[in-house]
Amino acid sequence: MEWNTLVLGLLVLSVVASSNNTSTASTPRPSSSTHASTTVKATTVATTSTTTATSTSSTTSAKPGSTTHDPNVMRPHAHNDFYNAHCTSHMYELSLSSFAAWWTMLNALILMGAFCIVLRHCCFQNFTATTTKGY
């Protein structure tokens, strides 16, 4: 019985020693130029009392809230302009130096061309139908 108590006590102490972690969570602020971070330290307190016949071990953990994922998924970028959460549309500068800009322009031209072809077809069909009606 005492061998099991000793193993249980060592197990509790090793868990307590390995669970002293510090986690950091970033909290977003309304201003676009300041960033703040809040540090939350998780502390674990272990109490072990041993008598000759029985042993009682209890572990109390004071954690603010355990989540498995990071709710603050937006991280500051090196060029914190367009992807900033507080960026508005007038802050974005248009340029033709990227592939995405050329691809968007090509798609817009294709759509406008297809629209013109469809309109010409419909209008031409209507025009020929009305002008050849009397013949």
UniProtKB/Swiss-Prot annotation:
Main location: virion
Keyword Transmembrane helix applies: yes
Keyword Signal: yes
Residue spans crossing the bilayer: 99-119
Intravirion face of the membrane: 120-135
Highest taxon of source: Viruses
Signal peptide extent: 1-19
Compartments (UniProt record): Virion membrane; Host membrane; Host Golgi apparatus, Host trans-Golgi network
Region feature (Disordered): 21-73
Record-level GO cellular component terms: host cell Golgi apparatus; host cell membrane; plasma membrane; viral envelope; virion membrane
The record's account of how the chain is modified after translation: O-glycosylated.
Virion surface side: 20-98
Membrane topology field: Single-pass type I membrane protein
Compositionally skewed regions (Low complexity) per UniProt: 21-68
Record keywords: Disulfide bond, Host Golgi apparatus, Host membrane, Membrane, Signal, Transmembrane, Transmembrane helix, Viral envelope protein, Virion
Job of this protein: Envelope glycoprotein necessary for proper maturation of gM and modulation of its membrane fusion activity. Also plays a critical role in virion morphogenesis.
Subunit structure comment from the entry: Interacts (via N-terminus) with gM (via N-terminus). The gM-gN heterodimer forms the gCII complex.
Family in the record: Belongs to the herpesviridae glycoprotein N family.
Name of this chain's protein: Envelope glycoprotein N
Annotated organism of origin: Human cytomegalovirus (strain Merlin) (HHV-5)
